[in-house]
């Protein structure tokens, strides 16, 4: 799979992890009547993935005609299930050591907004005939959370492996990393932002993300 395709798919699986809301509980209840309910972490992945694909199919025409509606839809759920501050801390890596919480949040917000702004439109071109299958669930070392291994089943191609790393935050499972065919969201952007962060402060990098001077998935300069 080409890098650009991986980035587009990364956006989709990130969104599918983020966009579970009240209707997702319907999927959970329906599943419980036919087979033993999966764990809460696995159900998070299954229900949210199903939700995003279903919603894309139902509202595709609306979103194509009104990009602002797509952005609002994504942003309205972004904070619900994605632990963006923790993920941002992991992306910052060594640069997060000793950093103020406010600076990390500033970077987290700028990173999330830039990601969805650049790749959000890719959602409209994605194949909604995909099915999601949860394969396994494994505890992460050190009690850091759980890895939920899943596959996106395509009618015209090999399954796409997608792993979600989730952890408990205030009694709720939240996603902090997604790996598509072994490509990690956290590691991808840690590699991109390492060089800029060696030259500039976290607020400066966040500001450049906000203005578009620097873009996620770019070369670090937005050029």
Residue locations for each model-derived region?
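Low-complexity, intrinsically disordered terminal/linker segments enriched in charged
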Residues: 177-223
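Bacterial N-terminal signal peptides that target proteins for export
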Residues: 2-16, 24
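Surface-exposed, charged secondary-structure patches
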Residues: 117-160, 212-223
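Sec/Tat signal peptide C-region and signal peptidase I cleavage site
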Residues: 22-28
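Short beta-strand edge/turn micro-motifs at domain boundaries
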Residues: 159-187
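Compositionally biased, proline/threonine/alanine/serine-rich low-complexity intrinsically disordered stretches
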Residues: 28-50, 54, 207, 211-223
